[in-house]
């Protein structure tokens, strides 16, 4: 299981998603005077130090959590490559939905009502963007394994 390259890619995807859950994905500079508020996948930490769980951010948290869990589950389905490939496709779709939701929040189309101001990007917002690349590489590895098994079956 661990010697397969797609296992390493999926494990890296899990780690990247988990890190993305715990680090800020954006900062909001207030319109007036004050300190910046940090936006996490679950909510907003205001400049005064208060935590506000935002309904706007909950879909980000759910999508990234499900993505991490699906990537972890996919690692242990190494005996069933077809299911592994379909879960990889679903995982990539969820990650694309996360990126779309984040961009809508970043552009202000979906506002965060807890704080007002201009939102900026933080480093952790790049982590869920790297994750679909890792899952796509894992998908390619699983697909190559499937082709190899089919070729071996034809030889017999």
Task: List each language-model region with its residue ranges.
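Cytoplasmic juxtamembrane regions at transmembrane-helix boundaries
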Residues: 11, 72-95, 154-156
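Membrane-helix exit/juxtamembrane interface segments
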Residues: 19-44
């Amino acid at each position: 299981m661990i010697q397969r390259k797609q296992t390493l890619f999926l494990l890296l995807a899990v780690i990247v998603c988990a890190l993305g859950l715990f680090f800020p994905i954006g900062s909001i500079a207030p319109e007036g005077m004050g300190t910046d508020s940090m936006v996490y996948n679950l909510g907003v930490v205001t400049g005064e130090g208060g935590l506000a769980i935002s309904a706007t951010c909950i879909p980000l948290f759910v999508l990234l959590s499900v993505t991490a869990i699906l990537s972890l589950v996919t690692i242990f389905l190494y005996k069933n490559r077809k299911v592994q490939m379909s879960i990889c496709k679903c995982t990539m779709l969820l990650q694309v939905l996360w990126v779309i939701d984040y961009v809508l929040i970043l552009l202000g189309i979906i506002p965060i009502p807890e704080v007002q101001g201009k939102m900026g990007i933080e480093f952790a917002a790049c982590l869920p963007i790297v994750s679909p690349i890792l899952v796509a590489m894992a998908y390619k590895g699983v697909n190559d394994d499937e082709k190899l098994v089919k070729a071996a079956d034809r030889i017999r």
